[in-house]
Amino acid sequence: NNILSTSGGVAITKGKFNRFTVQVIEGNQGPYRLPGAEGELFVIVLAGTERVYLDGVILSRGYDRDYIIDYNSGEVTFMPSRIITKDSRIVVEYEYSNQQYLRSFYNLNVNYNTKKWNFNFNSYSEQDGKNSARGRDLTAEDKLALGASGDSINNTLVNSIREIEPSNKSIVVSYSLIDTTVNGKLFSILKFPWQEGSTRYIADFTDVGARNGYYNRVNEGVNGRVYRFVGEDAAGRPLGQYNPLSKLTAPNRKQMFTFGTTWKVDSNTIVTAEGALSGLDNNRFSAKDDADNQGIGLNINIVKNNMIFRKKGNWKGDVGVMYERVDKDFNIINPYRNQEFTRDWNITNIVKETQHLGRAFLNQRFGKKLYLNYGVSGLFQDIYFQGIKQEASIGLTLKKTTITTNISYLNSQSPTERSQFSRPSATITQQLPKLGNMIISLSYQSEFNKRASVVADTLLASSFAFQILRLSIVNNFTKNIATEVYTQRRNDYQPFT
């Protein structure tokens, strides 16, 4: 029963992916603007591609639900059912329209299956074309500038003034190019509106900061942004904020090649291993800074399910170990770790360094009424981060009563701080069949995050703690109709207060 299967695909993609952590403002429901992956301030989000998370929970779109989104402006607004506070953690994943370059991708997948083994090979490549940017061809000067910039493309600005046909009626804002003298200096400047009979020009303007540019934005009562030359003062210092420059974005290429295998040792034991080679070329026009383009990743898992510890009482358990190594130059196509990963590990500064992540767990079931889960994990990045995290959960069901408890405890250290992060929680739920299947639940949730300076051995202002106590009553009138009444109290604690 050996089976070999292959699949592949080629396509032109509409957009690029980004994961963005929103910087929230206390009491501000929005709108919050979503930027591009390369720092673009204004993007068009592709409809239906967004996934919005609040405190690790995915939200639903709609006026009668959690949030709404304006795809054209790339702005998210939250509904009154989700009150935004300074402690809210909002992460948005989305794809946005990328009009810089024509973007294509291809993938190839090969699988070979036997009774006990599976081997797979996957390749993926996503790249920008080199021919067009912002709807116009790159000039020879543009390509030379990109070739010299390497990966430092954020500082590459080029002249954006270009000619267009006088008969082009689709463009409202256009200019004439004239010569003028300021302080004895000769300037060739753009003047609005375009004068018929002269060469017609358009330009993209970039904000270079107050008193750093020669143009300012003005209101001319037309459908479009108009800029006027304002020159410089007597000391030769510019008076404006904008210049006719455009920020060059280099075409990039992302690639991933993986080889993996799965071994079914027996009906309950599985061993999986996968290696990956990534490639990221941030500038296809330049060979400069290409030394860090390739990186390697490795993942190994061993899991044994349904181990019988005691036949009487049906005591069974699952055990497993996992190891993951990610090279410092390894670049993923899209984020594969959950949105709360950095918070779970109390990471404040992301360091580009080889990362080792390991985990071992035991999930024990004592019949149908009691379970106990325990896991220990370690995350290490050379001298930049070392963390050990322990997690445990217990669940007990007694007729109509259910009790669950969870706790996570992290000990971590970086070159600047030590931290201890504990998160205990518990819930008791009681069903009352004689009262129309009413359900009463009492829950407790807390977090204690203690951060201390390594140098001064003092508590840092980023430390925090909170406790939440919640009482809830749910009344199920029918299968489709239910009501919930709850009361909740939260206490927040900050250092030095």
Predicted regions and their residues:
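Surface-exposed, low-hydrophobicity segments enriched in Gly/Pro/acidic/Ser residues
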Residues: 1-497
